[in-house]
């Protein structure tokens, strides 16, 4: 399961799409067809500034249901990272409304964090492909939507 909002959410949704291309069962929390979450499930949440209330709420509910919570953030001092997450992945890049000591950027708002998310997620995908015998980009492309 994945969750994010705004442009951070778009980067996270792109990650979910690639996981689906790999044949993984993946659900975007906001979709109406998302099943219940529970024991043995993983929720990956992106929240740049660490203070997105409704994402914190969903992470708390998922944790209560038995899911593991991984948080990718530019602000590890946020409530979700400190109080809910099982694992925190700190991306030290400027985020929208961020307050932590991170790599500054002249780009507007949270661009640097969003760009770093996309690169991080692509590296994770490439690593999984490299470490999965028989998984190729050609096989992944067979799971690409074919009604475009």
Segments from the language model and where they lie:
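Glycine-rich phosphate-binding loops that contact phosphosugars or nucleotide phosphates
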Residues: 2-119, 126
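A short, charged, Gly/Pro-tolerant segment at domain boundaries
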Residues: 123, 129-148
């Amino acid at each position: 399961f994945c969750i994010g909002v705004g442009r951070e959410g778009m980067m996270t949704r792109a990650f979910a799409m690639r996981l689906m291309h790999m044949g993984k069962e993946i659900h975007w929390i906001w979709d109406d067809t998302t099943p219940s979450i529970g024991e043995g499930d993983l929720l990956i949440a992106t929240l740049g500034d660490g203070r997105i209330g409704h994402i914190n709420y969903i992470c708390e509910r998922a944790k209560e249901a038995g899911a593991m919570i991984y948080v990718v953030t530019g602000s590890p001092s946020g409530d979700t990272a400190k109080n809910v997450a099982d694992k925190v992945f700190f991306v030290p890049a400027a985020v929208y409304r961020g307050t932590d000591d991170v790599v500054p950027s002249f780009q507007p708002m949270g661009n640097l964090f969003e760009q770093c998310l996309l690169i991080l997620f692509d590296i994770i995908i490439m690593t999984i492909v490299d470490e999965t015998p028989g998984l190729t980009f050609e096989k992944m492309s067979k799971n690409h939507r074919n009604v475009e």
